Amino acid sequence: MGDQRGTRVYVGNLTDKVKKDDLEGEFTKYGKLNSVWIAFNPPGFAFVEFEHRDDAEKACDILNGSELLGSQLRVEISKGRPRQGRRGGPMDRGGRRGDFGRHSITSGGSGGGGFRQRGSSGSSSRHTERGYSSGRSGASSYNGREGGGSGFNRREVYGGGRDSSRYSSGSSASYGRTGGQSAGRFRSRSPVGNHRF
């Protein structure tokens, strides 16, 4: 009994001189054939289907590399749609590289820009916040470090404008009053202390 579908054999490296009858006459020596098909567009290969797989394998072993009408034959068992497998691999690998690149560009563009923006004002703004809370820096020192339009934007973000001017005037006034009162009390007490001794 033959195989249910037969076994197809690929025959390559054919010249224009090789015809269907030539292949059929050569391959039928090794077993019963179901069909012989020669490609014309593009030319150069053919398929020969054997009824029995054992006969097909024997023909491949003997005829592969042999010469027929000036053609050095390439004869092997047909593997079935090998082109799709080769085409699928590179497409998958190429698709994965395009997504990481786009992802890298997108994330790098937005993330890097945000990082540079934070980095340009992050250290000075953090020092400025500590300066406001401790009452040692004031608005004048903040403006001196930053200066220009960038200082104006950051004063709005970190409580500048009226708040900074009110704080600077209030802190200087309170500091002056405190310093004056403490100095006055110290001077007023020192003569009394000396008089007692």
UniProtKB/Swiss-Prot annotation:
Gene3D superfamilies: 3.30.70.330
Residue numbers carrying Phosphoserine: S168, S171, S174, S188, S190
Biased composition (Basic and acidic residues): 89-102
Ranges of biased composition (kind: Low complexity): 117-144, 166-176
Chain positions found as Phosphothreonine: T106
Posttranslational modification: Extensively phosphorylated on serine residues in the RS domain.
Keyword set, alphabetical order: Nucleus, Phosphoprotein, RNA-binding
Stretches of the chain forming a coiled coil according to its record: none
Cited InterPro entries: Nucleotide-bd_a/b_plait_sf (IPR012677), RBD_domain_sf (IPR035979), RRM_dom (IPR000504)
GO cellular component annotations of the record: nuclear speck; nucleus
Residue span(s) of domain RRM: 7-80
Location (main, coarse): nucleus
GO MF term list: mRNA binding
Biological process annotations from GO: mRNA cis splicing, via spliceosome; regulation of alternative mRNA splicing, via spliceosome; regulation of gene expression; regulation of mRNA 3'-end processing; regulation of transcriptional start site selection at RNA polymerase II promoter
Segments passing through the bilayer: none
Region (Disordered) residue spans: 74-197
Compartments where located: Nucleus
Any Pfam family matching the protein: RRM_1
Biological function: May control important aspects of development.
Family stated for the protein in its record: Belongs to the splicing factor SR family.
Record-given protein name: RNA-binding protein Rsf1
